[in-house]
């Protein structure tokens, strides 16, 4: 019978043989059988050798064997080997490949930890703006068209915080300068102003004038705005070939009561000889917050959601609300909307930042849950980077603690940022202020809050203080805690009312005051779930 693999090329076969030698009685009985039985047994042993071959080794179709023959030919596998094999199957294939290709990540190495933190820092500008190619192209085409035609124009960008507006504007500025050199045109004079740094909103005109006429003595008889208006209205301005690119970041800070500053800034682009290209970024968000509870397995946490509508209506109509004269002059600025990042976009940006590192510091499912929760909350990329850095710090504290306990112990395998680290970081970042308030309350006030949560689970929306006190006494009695008197109980309810947890109505008698719950029951459960006593009280 032809052999499946030769003795010298099949170490697995020798392993099988050595293991099967330990079964002494069975092996000796097998030697004393007939030649036919021996051939069958040998073929079974060869088939069993193919079973333990690696995936990349040569394999043949397996033959059916009876349970008795399997017990003889196949060696027993320990529980540890089965567990190890199952862990290898459950392991993420992407991380496995990366771990094989890249060097091993050691969280105890200060240099490696520093490199990961720098890669995830907000101040680190990536070489390319990922997931904002279309928006960046629209802005660049606008600037390019103005420079080719030597014509002024205005554009504003609206979007939620952390959607890449400022970073994209910096890339557009560099693109415009590079394109102007290639086209043989003068590079535009660029003025970048962060409006949050201005002492007064009118200071933006001084910034523009100082850059436009650097080295020239300012005319004290005219204001900076008047001097700019004269410069862009004089005939000799036609001989000036350079364009001026004004980038006003956080331009909504210029919105005053009379809207005069914002209006005059855009009006500079409508002057007959103006060569201003004005680009402004506008922060826009509807300030509505609510708490959303998310469960992952047996772990649940809450985070604050800030609504940023898909159309960003309060920014798109900025020209209609604050710049009505521009619309009448047919000079309405162009609008480019930067929408909040989606889950896939956040995940891609995180991977782009980490792929350059020579090691793997995050599990893929940990990055995925971070992207999912941040996109559901706000779509703020800066928040996602903050969460990842926080998860990395949690791992660092965990590793430092293990070093203190076992200074000479071996380094544990695969000490990367896992799901539990990321969930803890998300809970820390998006935790509601009311959760902190409930957690910092004294014990008896926390018992009152638990009593209120149980009292309002049904259809009844409010109860009297006497009814709430009855539930409070039941919890104290079952836990053998000395309860407070009715007067002290009423005073504690007043304190909870002042903190926005309970709502008390007015009544002549304290016992007749109506009590209702201002916070969500899920907030109370989330705040007190770590304490077994309160967890049992809320059942």
Swiss-Prot record:
Coiled coil: none annotated. Highly expressed in roots, flower buds and etiolated seedlings. Expressed in leaves and stems. Highly expressed in proliferating cells such as root meristems, leaf primordia and young growing leaves, as well as cells undergoing endoreduplication cycles. Residues 1-40 are annotated as: Disordered. The keyword Chloroplast does not apply. Disulfide bonds: none annotated. GO terms for cellular component: nucleus. It is found in: Nucleus. A motif (Nuclear localization signal) lies at residues 35-38. InterPro entries: AAA_22 (IPR049945), Cdc6/18 (IPR016314), Cdc6_C (IPR015163), Cdc6_ORC1-like_ATPase_lid (IPR054425), ORC1/CDC6 (IPR050311), P-loop_NTPase (IPR027417), WH-like_DNA-bd_sf (IPR036388), WH_DNA-bd_sf (IPR036390). Keywords: Cell cycle, Cell division, DNA replication, Nucleus. One of its GO terms (biological process) is cell division. It comes from the Eukaryota. Its main location: nucleus. Induction: Cell cycle regulated. Up-regulated at the G1/S phase transition and then decreases rapidly as cells progress into S-phase. Degraded in a proteasome-dependent manner in proliferating cells, but not in endoreduplicating cells. One of its GO terms (molecular function) is ATP hydrolysis activity. Cells expressing ectopically CDC6 have increased levels of endopolyploidy. May be involved in the initiation of DNA replication. May play a role in endoreduplication. Could act as one of the factors that contributes to maintain endoreduplication competence. Belongs to the CDC6/cdc18 family. This is Cell division control protein 6 homolog. The gene is CDC6.
């Amino acid at each position: 019978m032809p052999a499946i693999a030769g003795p010298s090329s099949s170490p697995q076969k020798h392993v099988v043989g050595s293991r099967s030698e330990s079964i002494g009685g069975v092996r000796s009985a097998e030697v004393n059988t007939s030649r036919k039985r021996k051939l069958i047994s040998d073929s079974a042993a060869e088939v069993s050798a193919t079973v333990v071959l690696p995936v990349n080794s040569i394999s043949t179709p397996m033959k059916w064997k009876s349970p008795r023959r399997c017990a003889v030919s196949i060696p027993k596998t320990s529980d540890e080997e089965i567990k190890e094999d199952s862990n290898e199957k459950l392991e993420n294939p992407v991380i496995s490949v990366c771990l094989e290709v890249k060097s091993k990540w050691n969280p105890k190495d200060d240099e490696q930890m520093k490199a990961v933190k720098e890669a995830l820092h907000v101040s680190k500008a990536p070489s390319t703006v990922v997931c904002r190619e279309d928006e960046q192209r629209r802005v660049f085409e606008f600037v390019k068209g103005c420079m080719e035609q030597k014509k002024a124009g205005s554009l504003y960008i609206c979007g939620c915080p952390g959607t890449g507006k400022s970073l994209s504007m910096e890339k557009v500025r560099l693109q415009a300068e590079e394109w102007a050199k290639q086209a043989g045109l003068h590079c535009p004079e660029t003025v970048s102003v962060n409006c949050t740094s201005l002492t007064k909103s009118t200071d933006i005109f001084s910034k523009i004038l100082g850059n436009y006429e650097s080295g020239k003595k300012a005319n004290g008889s005219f204001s900076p705005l008047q001097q700019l208006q004269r410069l862009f209205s004089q005939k000799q301005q036609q001989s000036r070939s350079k364009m001026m690119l004004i980038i006003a970041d956080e331009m909504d800070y210029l919105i005053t009561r009379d809207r005069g500053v914002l209006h005059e800034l855009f009006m500079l682009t409508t002057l007959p000889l103006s060569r201003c290209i004005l680009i402004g970024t506008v922060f826009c968000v509807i300030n509505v917050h609510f708490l959303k509870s998310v469960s992952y397995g047996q772990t649940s946490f809450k985070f604050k959601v800030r609504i940023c509508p898909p159309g960003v209506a309060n920014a798109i109509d900025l020209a209609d609300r604050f710049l009505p004269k521009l619309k009448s002059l047919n000079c309405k600025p162009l609008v480019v909307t930067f929408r909040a990042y989606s889950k896939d976009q956040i995940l891609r940006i995180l991977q782009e930042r980490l792929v350059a590192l020579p090691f793997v510091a995050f599990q893929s499912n940990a990055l995925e849950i971070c992207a999912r929760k941040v996109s559901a909350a706000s779509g703020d990329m800066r928040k996602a980077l903050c969460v990842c850095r926080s998860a990395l710090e949690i791992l660092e504290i965990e590793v430092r603690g293990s070093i203190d306990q076992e200074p000479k112990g071996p380094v544990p395998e695969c000490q990367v940022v896992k799901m539990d680290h990321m969930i803890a970081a998300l809970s820390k970042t998006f935790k509601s202020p009311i959760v902190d308030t409930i957690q910092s309350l004294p014990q008896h006030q926390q018992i009152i809050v638990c009593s209120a949560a149980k009292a309002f689970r049904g259809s009844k929306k409010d109860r009297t203080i006497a009814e709430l006190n009855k539930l409070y006494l039941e919890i104290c009695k079952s836990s053998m805690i000395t309860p407070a008197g009715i007067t002290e109980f009423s005073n504690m309810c007043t304190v909870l009312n002042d903190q926005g947890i309970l709502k008390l109505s007015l009544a002549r008698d304290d016992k007749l005051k109506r009590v209702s719950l201002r916070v969500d029951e899920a907030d109370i459960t989330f705040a007190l779930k770590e304490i077994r006593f309160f967890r049992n009280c809320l059942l």
